[in-house]
């Protein structure tokens, strides 16, 4: 048995969906432990493109149990839409389980999220506008609604009437928006409760039952380390904890249940939204990475900012998450470049620094210190083993492994499942007997 956490080692969008899908073949249970519909992952199976925001990637395997844990925030309308989409593609998701204690995103959360972001003006954060921050805010203020509350219409009415009245005051007085009709909202969410009732369970109990039965459990994070509320580039972060420790809180397990942690990182770096980005590129190189990598957000459709691989934030992600190994994705995007740069340190106010600064103003002043490596200028898309890779591509991977001080277990060379090199099974294989410098 092995219980594994998969996290993003950058600013999200690293390709965790594909890696989780790949690892789900060896998992009995897959748990999504934080985030909401602000995250998205794309899976390509036999040329079929599936885009999911809430449902774990493991749903494509009929023998894998998928759980949406307590640390997530659930938009029931989106969840029902994903279930319908899967059904239309002949994928059975009837076994999906949603934590009864997961908090619910409501219409006023979305409206407030969008209004607050607009009001920030030049200080905007880059929120997706899906209501995630306000949902987590209500959770922290102990005024939120949980999935279990949707199952009892009378309780739902009691729990919603006060908050709707209070949020309507905010919408009207602060933002000049029309108020919500309380009866319409209550009726809508009572209907969601009826339609989702068969999926709502005590997920923490289900996870511990699986652990006692010595099942393989895969914990799937959303977003990435640098978007973590406590450890990311605050305030340009999400409202939850994507780091490995967040799996324990969001799933309701102790750290001793986790056997290993896998970090997913692109062979370059991207970021959506606002905030400092030391290795960001502009012009034709940025356009090349964006076009070759299809760098447009699954959730928002926004173009992602692109830059060179940043080893400083990479090492920080290794430390914060206790990474055992890495999955490097989109190596093929670099195939046509004659030179590739990698950030190995920063220069801050004339001093070389090797660490990620906690101060946002300091991080904004950091200039990258690059090392330049030769490109391989040949396609890697059809490579299926390390021996198939060009030597310069292998040298690049070894350089990243040495820089990050952690071995590489998986190399992804395209969106499809088969465009993958598994150096060593990161679930069942020996720790650290993988690709390293």
From Swiss-Prot:
Pfam families: Adenylsucc_synt (PF00709)
Major location (coarse): cytoplasm
GO aspect biological process, one term: IMP metabolic process
Residues the record lists as binding substrate: 298-304
Catalytic reaction list: IMP + L-aspartate + GTP = N(6)-(1,2-dicarboxyethyl)-AMP + GDP + phosphate + 2 H(+)
Domain of life, source organism: Bacteria
Active site: 13, 41
UniProt keyword Lipoprotein, yes or no: no
GO molecular function, one term: adenylosuccinate synthase activity
Gene3D superfamilies: Adenylosuccinate Synthetase, subunit A, domain 1, Adenylosuccinate Synthetase, subunit A, domain 2, Adenylosuccinate Synthetase, subunit A, domain 3
Pathway where this protein functions: Purine metabolism; AMP biosynthesis via de novo pathway; AMP from IMP: step 1/2
Catalytic activity, EC: 6.3.4.4
UniProt binding sites for GTP: 12-18, 40-42, 304, 330-332, 412-414
Positions with a binding annotation for IMP: 13-16, 38-41, 128, 142, 223, 238, 302
Cofactor binding description: Binds 1 Mg(2+) ion per subunit.
Family: Belongs to the adenylosuccinate synthetase family.
Function field: Plays an important role in the de novo pathway of purine nucleotide biosynthesis. Catalyzes the first committed step in the biosynthesis of AMP from IMP.
Record-given protein name: Adenylosuccinate synthetase
Taxonomic path: Bacteria, Bacillati, Cyanobacteriota, Cyanophyceae, Synechococcales
Gene name of the encoded protein: purA
């Amino acid at each position: 048995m092995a219980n594994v956490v998969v996290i993003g080692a950058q600013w999200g969008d690293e390709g965790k969906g594909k890696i989780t899908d790949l690892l789900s073949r060896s998992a009995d249970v897959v748990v999504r432990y934080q985030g909401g519909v602000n995250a998205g992952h794309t899976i390509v199976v036999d040329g079929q493109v599936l885009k999911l925001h809430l449902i774990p990637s493991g749903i494509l395997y009929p023998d894998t149990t998928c759980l949406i844990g307590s640390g997530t925030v659930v938009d029931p309308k989106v969840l029902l839409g994903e279930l319908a989409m899967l059904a239309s593609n002949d994928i059975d998701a009837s076994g999906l389980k949603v934590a009864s204690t997961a908090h619910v995103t409501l219409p006023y959360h979305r409206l407030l999220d969008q209004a607050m972001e607009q009001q920030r003006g030049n200080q905007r954060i880059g929120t997706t506008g899906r209501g995630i921050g306000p949902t987590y805010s209500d959770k922290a203020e102990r005024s939120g609604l949980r999935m279990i509350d949707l199952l009892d219409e009378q309780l739902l009415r009691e729990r919603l009437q006060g908050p709707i009245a209070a949020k309507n005051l905010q919408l009207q007085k602060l933002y000049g928006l029309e108020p919500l009709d309380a009866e319409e909202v209550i009726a809508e969410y009572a209907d969601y409760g009826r339609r989702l009732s068969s999926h709502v369970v005590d997920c923490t109990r289900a996870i511990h039952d699986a652990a006692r039965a010595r099942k393989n459990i895969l914990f799937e994070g959303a977003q990435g380390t640098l978007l973590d509320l406590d450890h990311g580039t605050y305030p340009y972060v999400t409202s939850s904890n994507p780091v490995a420790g967040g799996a324990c809180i969001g799933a309701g397990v102790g750290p001793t249940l986790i056997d290993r942690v896998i970090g997913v990182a692109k062979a370059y770096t991207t970021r959506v939204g606002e905030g400092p980005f030391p290795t960001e590129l502009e012009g034709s190189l940025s356009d090349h990475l964006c076009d070759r990598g299809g760098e447009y957000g699954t959730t928002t459709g926004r173009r992602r900012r692109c830059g060179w691989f940043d080893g400083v934030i990479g090492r920080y992600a290794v430390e914060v998450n206790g990474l055992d190994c890495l999955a490097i994705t989109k190596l093929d995007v670099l195939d046509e470049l004659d030179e590739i740069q990698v950030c190995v340190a920063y220069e801050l106010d004339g001093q070389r620094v090797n660490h990620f600064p906690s101060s946002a103003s300091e991080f904004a002043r950091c200039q990258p210190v690059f090392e330049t490596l030769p490109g391989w200028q040949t396609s890697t898309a059809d490579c299926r083993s390390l021996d198939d890779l060009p030597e310069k591509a292998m040298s690049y991977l070894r350089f990243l492994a040495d820089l990050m001080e952690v071995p590489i277990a998986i190399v992804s060379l395209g969106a499809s499942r088969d465009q993958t090199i598994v150096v060593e099974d990161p679930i069942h294989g020996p720790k650290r007997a993988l690709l390293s410098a």
